[in-house]
């Protein structure tokens, strides 16, 4: 999946110029899901090698990932001695060759590092790569997984009801309980079970944020 915004020009070198990952890659800045925003509580007990310095660009540090996992956006980045030097700003490139940029903290110069210098991250700020890979399709004839949501409703109350039954309940106009064993739960306009506006399950407003999430993405997977 890709995040909001494209990769900044001039960040890449050679064949990786721009680090545009195309389909299934990472590109751009994080906002929305996957971003990490909280107070700085100091360095973690353990840090793990995250990236290797490539070059400085526009005041930021461009790194090649040397970790099999994906960092959170805005995750603190450290030196091996746990000195904080900045935060993850962008994640770029295809999912099998990830790059990321570090926005240095005040007083840290991106040009003060040299090629091959290592940067580290706390283990709790990493996500497994599998989270961003498409799920395999079930074999033909395999039973479909049941949707989470309300159980199938019974017959409900009488069709006509007494006084106060409300017009439109039998016709399924404005929500309410569907009278004849409908799809269960509360629904606007039928559809699958659970709470829904025209579709099955839970449907968040606006769908998944941030587009398709084939790589590091913030929307659907």
UniProtKB/Swiss-Prot annotation:
Function: Non-catalytic component of the H/ACA small nucleolar ribonucleoprotein (H/ACA snoRNP), which catalyzes pseudouridylation of rRNA and is required for ribosome biogenesis. This involves the isomerization of uridine such that the ribose is subsequently attached to C5, instead of the normal N1. Pseudouridine ('psi') residues may serve to stabilize the conformation of rRNAs. The H/ACA snoRNP complex also mediates pseudouridylation of other types of RNAs. The H/ACA snoRNP complex mediates pseudouridylation at position 93 in U2 snRNA.
Keyword annotations of the record: Nucleus, Repeat, Ribonucleoprotein, Ribosome biogenesis, RNA-binding, rRNA processing
RGG-box 1: annotated segments: 4-35
InterPro entries for the chain: Gar1/Naf1_Cbf5-bd_sf (IPR038664), H/ACA_rnp_Gar1/Naf1 (IPR007504), Transl_B-barrel_sf (IPR009000)
Recorded GO MF terms: box H/ACA snoRNA binding
Subunit structure: Component of the small nucleolar ribonucleoprotein particles containing H/ACA-type snoRNAs (H/ACA snoRNPs).
Region entry Disordered, spans: 1-42, 130-221
Gene: GAR1
Protein name (record): H/ACA ribonucleoprotein complex subunit GAR1
UniProt keyword RNA-binding present: yes
Principal location: nucleus
Biological process (GO), any one: snoRNA guided rRNA pseudouridine synthesis
Annotated GO CC locations: box H/ACA snoRNP complex
Tagged with keyword Repeat: yes
PANTHER family xrefs: H_ACA RIBONUCLEOPROTEIN COMPLEX SUBUNIT 1, NUCLEOLAR PROTEIN FAMILY A MEMBER 1 SNORNP PROTEIN GAR1
Region ranges (RGG-box 2): 152-220
Similarity-based family: Belongs to the GAR1 family.
Compositionally skewed regions (Gly residues) per UniProt: 1-35, 150-221
Subcellular location: Nucleus, Nucleolus
Highest taxon of the lineage: Eukaryota
């Amino acid at each position: 999946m890709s995040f909001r915004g494209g990769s900044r020009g001039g960040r890449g070198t050679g064949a990786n110029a721009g680090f545009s990952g195309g389909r299934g890659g990472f590109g751009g800045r994080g906002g929305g899901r996957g971003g990490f925003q909280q107070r700085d509580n100091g360095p973690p007990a353990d840090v793990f090698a995250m990236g290797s310095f490539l070059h400085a660009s526009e005041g930021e540090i461009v790194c090649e990932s040397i970790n099999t996992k994906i960092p959170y956006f805005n995750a603190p980045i450290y030196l091996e001695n746990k000195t904080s030097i900045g935060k993850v700003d962008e994640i770029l490139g295809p999912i099998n060759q990830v790059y990321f940029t570090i926005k240095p903290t005040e007083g840290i110069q991106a040009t003060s590092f040299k090629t091959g210098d290592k940067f580290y991250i706390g283990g709790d700020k990493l996500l497994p790569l599998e989270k961003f890979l498409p799920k395999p399709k079930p074999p033909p004839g395999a039973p479909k997984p049941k949707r989470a949501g309300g159980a199938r409703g019974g017959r409900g109350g009488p069709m006509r009801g007494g006084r106060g039954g409300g017009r439109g309940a039998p016709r399924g106009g404005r929500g309410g309980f569907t009278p004849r064993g409908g799809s269960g739960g509360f629904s606007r306009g039928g559809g699958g079970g659970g709470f829904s506006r025209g579709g099955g399950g839970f449907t968040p407003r606006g769908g998944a944020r941030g587009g398709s999430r084939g790589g590091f993405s913030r929307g659907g997977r």
